[in-house]
């Protein structure tokens, strides 16, 4: 929706904003780091075509006016990247009412989770979730493009965003106004256009749900996570020793020294050879081709190998990243006042996130802290602390994605729901194994086992990938699809096909779910979760993944529902610290048992076809103690 911004000259005064049902807000800051940088100016736009830039450097009283406007406000305050604007405003003394905030970036992902997806027909081009791109696409307008040239003329350097945006706070208010006012205007125009699209496409439920979740996540971001910086320095020293051990082991397995980050040297040590048009590593693993025709030896390829050298390379890379990027950079270097302030990606956006709605962390990426490698976890996790005078309580959702899978399959197979009703602690892998007469876990490569069968179905890996995970024979095949794209896939051998057929015969509903989801994705172009989240398949692209994506998106929705319930159950007795994988870490009062009981009861709701279980991990003075981890160093 286009509004006439020129007639007011973009010179809004200290007006009464309470008369508007909606207005937009955008901040200009001295930098991007919360608790370090501050707001030096802000812009506001209203639906009657008024907009204005308020320069705090020249009008410090503008902050007081803004505080008086937002405190009692009952309408909608629209931002693009609301978390950033909220936190930077908070550090500058302005507490925006979180219940009144909306975010055009999050709404954009609800409308289309593929803005930044590259499809075969887009020829390598994709959009993004920036205000500039979305405004161009949906309202036919763009940000003030000359700002970088004007800043370069004033301060020197290249006329690029990266070079010039750090200079914005040094620019005169008249120049900042030319940049800032259009940002607020475009944000409001985009929001108004989104309102029409949301109603037209029936997206009200998921948009309302994400808006409800937003305050909980922003509060957690603003609180940050306490860290023990003295211990973090010790952890870096400990990780140095681990990395040296890893390196020595890797060189011994390779029989030579090499650079694990050099594609050429990695190809050489794994003895990649082309046989009959197929690339193979020295352990016989079939490798995909890169665009240049070379063998692909990325992390996925290394994980698929039986060669112990592959695991050694992955371990070394992971531990170097943990030491240098995570501990040294994000924890020690970027902590402020003994806390780190990671960003929680609520949806896919400018800085990461997922189209399924699954949460992730950046700066630092807390979900990347090793959990299965107990040795590394025991070194890293003591650095993370609960709030002063409280304890760290850790909990885990029991087989969370497996239960979501069971919930969806139970719509076509009531026996699964019945089995869970009779035993809420049911192990689905064991249940499937008993039905099929196969073990839960494999005792040797190539042995059919229920766990890998189930995981293959949950993530919709395809028969060939299931065969590969079971250690059974498979081969690469390829075909050209209707659009002329060459598709390569893993084709299962006879033995794997037989066990997969037996699985579908015994475990009714799994194939029905996959077939039905794929059919709807192809015919309608999208499928939908119970919360109303759309998962789109343009031109039916990769519709065979529909059921797996539905499982992931449903799990993401239920995880966000858990956040709401946990925050409500904690009340004033604690707070959420972080959520990694299927775990919830909380800071709680020392009298933690009744608090835990409230949280457990809130999460274990009876709204799905199978029960959800939240299991207690432990409590302690830091994350490691709560997990029962012991540092052997």
From Swiss-Prot:
Domain of life: Viruses
Catalyzed reactions: DNA(n) + a 2'-deoxyribonucleoside 5'-triphosphate = DNA(n+1) + diphosphate; dZTP + DNA(n) = DNA(n)-Z + diphosphate
Matches recorded under SUPFAM superfamilies: DNA/RNA polymerases (SSF56672), Ribonuclease H-like (SSF53098)
Gene3D superfamilies, per the entry: 3.30.70.370, 5' to 3' exonuclease, C-terminal subdomain, Ribonuclease H-like superfamily/Ribonuclease H, Taq DNA Polymerase, Chain T, domain 4
GO molecular function, one term: DNA-directed DNA polymerase activity
Annotated keywords: DNA replication, DNA-directed DNA polymerase, Nucleotidyltransferase, Transferase, Viral DNA replication
Family affiliation: Belongs to the DNA polymerase type-A family. DpoZ subfamily.
Function of the molecule: DNA polymerase that preferentially incorporates the non-canonical base aminoadenine/dZTP instead of adenine into the synthesized DNA. More efficient in using dZTP instead of dATP as a substrate. In addition to this preference for dZTP, the phage also encodes a dATP triphosphohydrolase that removes dATP and its precursor dADP from the nucleotide pool of the host.
Family matches, as NCBIfam families: phage_DpoZ_1
Descriptive protein name: DNA polymerase DpoZ
Species of provenance: Vibrio phage phiVC8
């Amino acid at each position: 929706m286009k509004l006439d911004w020129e007639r007011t000259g973009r010179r809004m005064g200290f007006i009464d904003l309470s008369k508007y049902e909606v207005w937009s807000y955008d901040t200009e800051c001295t930098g991007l780091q919360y608790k370090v940088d501050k707001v030096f100016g802000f812009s506001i736009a209203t639906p009657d075509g008024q907009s204005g830039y308020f320069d705090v450097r020249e009008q410090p009283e503008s902050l007081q006016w803004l505080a008086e406007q937002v405190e009692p406000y009952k309408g909608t305050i629209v931002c693009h990247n609301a978390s950033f604007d909220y936190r930077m405003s908070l550090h500058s003394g302005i507490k925006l009412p979180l219940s009144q905030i909306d975010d055009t970036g999050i709404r954009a992902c609800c409308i289309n989770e593929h803005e930044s997806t590259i499809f075969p027909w887009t020829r390598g081009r994709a959009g993004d979730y920036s205000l500039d791109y979305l405004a161009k696409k949906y309202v036919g307008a763009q940000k003030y493009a000359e700002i970088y040239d004007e800043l370069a003329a004033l301060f020197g350097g290249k006329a690029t965003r990266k070079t010039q945006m750090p200079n914005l706070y040094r620019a005169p208010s008249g120049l900042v106004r030319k940049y800032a006012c259009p940002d607020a205007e475009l944000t409001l125009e985009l929001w108004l256009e989104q309102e029409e699209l949301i109603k037209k496409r029936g997206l009200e439920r998921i948009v309302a749900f994400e808006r409800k979740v937003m305050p909980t996540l922003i509060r957690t971001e603003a609180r940050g996570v306490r860290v023990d910086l003295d211990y973090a320095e010790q952890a870096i020293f400990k990780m140095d020793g681990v990395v040296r051990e890893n390196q020595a082991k890797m060189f011994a397995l390779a029989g030579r020294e090499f650079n694990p980050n050099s594609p050429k040297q990695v190809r050489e040590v794994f003895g990649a050879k082309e046989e009959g048009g197929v690339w193979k590593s020295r352990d016989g693993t079939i490798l995909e081709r890169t665009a240049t025709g070379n063998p692909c030896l990325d992390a996925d390829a290394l994980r698929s190998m039986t060669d112990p050298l592959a695991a050694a390379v992955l371990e070394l890379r992971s531990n170097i990243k943990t030491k240098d990027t995570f501990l040294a950079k994000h924890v020690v270097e970027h902590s402020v006042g003994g806390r780190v302030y990671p960003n929680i990606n609520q949806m896919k956006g400018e800085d990461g996130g997922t189209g399924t709605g699954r949460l992730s962390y950046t700066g630092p990426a807390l979900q990347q802290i090793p959990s299965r490698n107990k040795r590394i976890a025991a070194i890293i996790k003591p650095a993370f602390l609960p709030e002063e005078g409280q304890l760290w309580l850790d909990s885990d959702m029991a087989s969370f994605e497996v239960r979501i899978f069971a919930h969806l399959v139970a719509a076509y197979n009531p026996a699964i729901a019945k089995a869970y009703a009779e035993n809420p602690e049911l192990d689905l892998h064991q249940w499937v194994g008993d039905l099929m007469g196969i073990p839960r876990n494999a005792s040797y490569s190539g042995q059919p086992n229920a766990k890998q069968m189930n995981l293959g179905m949950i993530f919709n890996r395809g028969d060939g990938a299931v065969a590969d995970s079971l250690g059974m024979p498979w081969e690469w095949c390829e075909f050209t699809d209707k659009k002329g794209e060459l598709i390569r896939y893993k084709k299962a051998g006879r033995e794997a096909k037989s066990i997969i057929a037996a699985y579908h015969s015994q475990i009714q509903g799994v194939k029905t779910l996959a077939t039905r989801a794929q059919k709807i994705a192809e015919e309608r172009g999208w499928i939908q979760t119970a919360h109303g989240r759309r998962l789109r398949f343009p031109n039916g692209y990769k519709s065979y993944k529909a059921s797996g994506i539905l499982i992931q998106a449903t799990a993401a929705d239920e995880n966000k529902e858990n956040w709401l319930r946990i925050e409500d159950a904690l009340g004033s007795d604690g707070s959420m610290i972080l959520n990694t994988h299927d775990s919830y870490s909380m800071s709680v009062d020392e009298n933690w048992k009744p608090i835990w009981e409230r949280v457990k009861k809130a999460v274990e709701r009876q709204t799905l076809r199978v029960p959800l279980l939240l299991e207690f991990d432990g409590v302690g003075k830091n994350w490691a103690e709560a997990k029962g981890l012991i540092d052997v160093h």
